[in-house]
Amino acid sequence: MKKNVIKGTSICVLLFLVTATNLMAQHICGTVTDMQNQPIGFANIVLLSARDSSFIQGSISQEDGSFEIIAPSPNTYIIKVSSIGYQTTYQKTQNSKKEHIVLSNDSFILEGVVITAKRPDYQIKDGNLVTRIENSLLSKSGTGNDVLKHIPGIQEKEGKFTVFGKGTPIIYINGREIRDLSELDRLSSTEIRQVEVVTNPGARYKADAKAVIRIKTVRQSGDGIGIDIRSTWGQSENSRLNEQLNLNYRHNSLDIFGTFQYIHNEYLLTRRVTQDIFVDTLWQQKNIMKEASLYNNYKGELGMNYQINNNQSVGIRYSLYASPKDKVWYKAESEILANGDYYDHLLSSSNSVTVKKPSQQINAYYSATFGQLTIDFNADALWSKVRTTNEIEETSHKQASRMIQSTNKVDNKLYAGKLLFSYPIAEGTFSFGSEYTHTHRYDLFANPQEILPTTDNHIKETHTGFFAEYNRFIRIAYLNIGLRYEHISSEHSYSNFFPNISLATQIGKFQTQLSYTTKIKRPFYNQLSSNMRYMNRFTYMSGNPDLKPETIHDLTLSGSYKWLQFMISYQREKDAILYITEQYKKNPAITTVTHRNFNRIDNFSAFLTASPAVGSWHPQLTVGVQKQWAKIEHNGETLQMDTPLFFCTLNNGIQLPYHWTLSTDINFQSKGDYQNIYMYQNVFMMNATLTKSFLNEHLSIHLQGIDLTHGRKDGNRIYNKHMNMDVANVSDSRELRFTIRYKFNTAKSKYKGKGAATEEIKRL
């Protein structure tokens, strides 16, 4: 604690020293627009001396075209503004007057066709990789999910996204945190303007935010009713449906929006599990399991946004989610050996039904600017109830057969708020604020046969955070420095400081950033639960109430040059949370699958992406490596778990005549080590998509082939002190998918709510 206080005090002093300089500087601000008065974002702003045209300072316009640049002293200067696709403009500053700079299109006429220069697809902005989607081939890809799959450094597996070398990101759409990844599926790719990947989030984000993805949509204008209808049918070994209706009404300053979605999914999974237990008796289990699942999900959303004036807006969003009856069935056959000799043979069948009662969530926000002071306030509330009943019938060849029944009741309540202030100080911007989250979780598990213990978990957790960060341009570099303090109060209390610092610069067309941050990974609530789940009479699953949070120190170098992007990262994880197997205390022949903290794991990761454009062909090649250093005690030996994982992705997009687009994606992942798991299966996948648009882009059809090679198969070997477990999974991942979408007068919501508790909601 003393070290944390010293560290925090040092950073606060540094913040004070930085903000206390150059108080006599001149703030020059304004907007950049085109000839139709539409804002131009990401234009290069250069401040030049009026005396000799020497370089003084540089900046970039924001998405809304606004910019602010700091001059060392009050004087007359020249502003040079350039953006690819527009003619470069020079303009003298008008003292304290707000500048309005208009750029003309940089185009030429060839045989009656106007050809306009295309903006680059990739750019480093404030040290973050920004990918522009609007009017690019990616805008034809389908949904927000399809877009993210093609962003450098982002990986997708079974509908979930990770940032390479970082982990699961927080995702924003127009500044609002999303809690349900199906929102990405509901978002059309044509509505996305850009995607920004933040690999080292600053102090304004919670300490467990290891990466952030910010999606900004295309600015829409005009009043009236907008309609967006989509229908998707998928066929693997089962059928899948996704039906969606979006409505939007906009009039003057009022914006009302609503969404309804129905999803029907069926899945098949075959799993082979082999367990070796090294105790006084060498126990071995060989299991073959076949699982089928059925889900029907209903999602509704209603919200409004009201623009009070040019500087203030307020809004509220209500979301409802229900899944009346999720069903999972499986049948398993298990052979048990003791010291290599036959011991027993088990046949098991399971029927599990989960009822997710309507989960309700409310988000409200207020956003305002008073002079140079910016205020953002967000509040969240969530209520959910889940009821699960499970019945397992187990037949033993040598012992008495069993019927195991269990019920699990989970109630969640969450209340959260976040307040953020920003104000320009000493050639930069100083931001500070606070965050509060209160969570109440009730988790009751019961087994009438008393084979498993009845547990009654009540978790009340209060999370309080305070943060401050400062960013500014220093000569040719962009500096961001911040400090966050968090206090967690529950059965175990934790107080921590989390510093971060980054420095970004540009040399010609080469842009780069070096950053350091400290993050934390808190256990999910089901990992902390003391509930036990029955698999068979030799295998249980359980949580671990004694799990501690995992601390991560991260040093990252990233950069971009023309159509090349790269990232190199080193991480040290303390108290890493590992998925382990161990012996049940009451009977060492029984395996318990749970989680434990591990002392330390060091990780190195790097990737390189090349995204050239060759005529109508737009390839994107990404190669990466991820290597760890970890030692695991196993059966009296020390295993060095340091085999690297290699990744390779090749995305190909081709623009065809008559509004046809073809894309193919090839993904490869090699064998290698992750934590205490050896992944012994190479994974090779191929996807293809054919898209056609009609009626001036109002109607579109998409034909997709998912995992055409049926290569999404995984094999994992888990090592522990007295046990190892092999798990091999094969699912019905090969799928043919057809989507038809119609949009009329669509306009994205102006909703600016950012959410106040996304990571806490994920833990629930």
Predicted regions and their residues:
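Face-selective signature of the C-terminal outer-membrane beta-barrel domain
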Residues: 297-324, 349-494, 499, 506, ...
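Short, acidic, small-residue-rich periplasmic hinge/interaction motif at the N-terminus
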Residues: 46-48, 82-86, 98-137, 157-158, ...
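Outer-membrane beta-barrel signature, preferentially recognizing the C-terminal barrel domain
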Residues: 459-461, 520-574, 592-604, 731-734
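Short acidic/polar hinge/loop motifs at secondary-structure boundaries
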Residues: 150, 176-202
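N-terminal periplasmic accessory domains that precede
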Residues: 96-102, 112, 144-147, 181-182, ...
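Surface-exposed extracellular loop regions of Gram-negative outer-membrane beta-barrel proteins
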Residues: 216-231, 270, 274, 286, ...
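A short, solvent-exposed loop/turn motif at the edges and junctions
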Residues: 48-54, 76-91
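Short, acidic Ser/Thr/Gly-rich low-complexity loop/linker segments typical of extracellular
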Residues: 51-66
